[in-house]
């Protein structure tokens, strides 16, 4: 069986989407004759923890090496699951973080993970290094390991690094440094995975040395095992259910939908009474306040965060 070293800060028991993608990749690697060893974060304070994902990783017999560091999340470990701050506060903290840390505030953990990974590679033979980004700092150290040990490297882009539409570069130096770091990391990479074609095209445009053959596109999918023995739910009502799964941040906001729903409720209450809006994930306090401010009918809204095994 071939051996793959997976470097991923985000891994169970942390929750949310980025965690699940890496977990599902590693869960099924053994089916294709690959044995994964995952280097990930130790105890952290995070917006969501999902013990069902942790049990899934244990059931799959994934070897996990947990690495503590001094990144902001690790320093908040004693608080466990922490509340997501209000959006304007999150933006301020994000701007400060992006000014201080290049390429991101996980750089402390990535440096520690590099040391741990180097020791592992000295003790065991691995056939591949796999890294999923963000955080981008772990791509930097994965490329360094590839160059030192001459082991093929695959990077999985869940989000763009340089050119990300949520990216913030406080100074020209920050912008230059981010692009330079990504350029060097990509130069060391043997294969690139992206979640969509648009991301692939942007990378090809930004870095002309890349070719179409360097890429594979693997969209976000689902795990069939999550739906084994799931019984269909027969809803008694015939309401139209509109569901949003995920979180809102930056310019991704529900306020336009909520305001439009309010206007529709004035003009055609008969229509809005037959609609339910479901928000699955973190729904910020300011958005809940907007629902209250607009005096929308409470029965039209469902706010919930579920672990992935909730039926």
List the predicted regions and their residue ranges.
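N-terminal subdomain of nucleotide-sugar transferases
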Residues: 1-72, 191, 200, 264
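A conserved catalytic-core segment of Leloir-type glycosyltransferases
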Residues: 41-111, 120
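Acidic anion/phosphate-binding donor-loop and adjacent secondary structure
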Residues: 72-78, 213-214, 221-238
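Membrane-proximal helix-turn-helix segments that form the acceptor-binding/catalytic region
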Residues: 137-140, 144-148, 173-194
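A short, active-site helix/loop in glycosyltransferases that binds the activated sugar's phosphate group
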Residues: 163, 183-214
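Carbohydrate-associated surface elements
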Residues: 198, 218-221
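Conserved donor-binding/catalytic core segment of Leloir-type glycosyltransferases
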Residues: 234-252, 258-261
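Nucleotide-activated donor-binding/catalytic signature segment of Leloir-type glycosyltransferases, i.e.
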Residues: 274, 279-281, 286-311
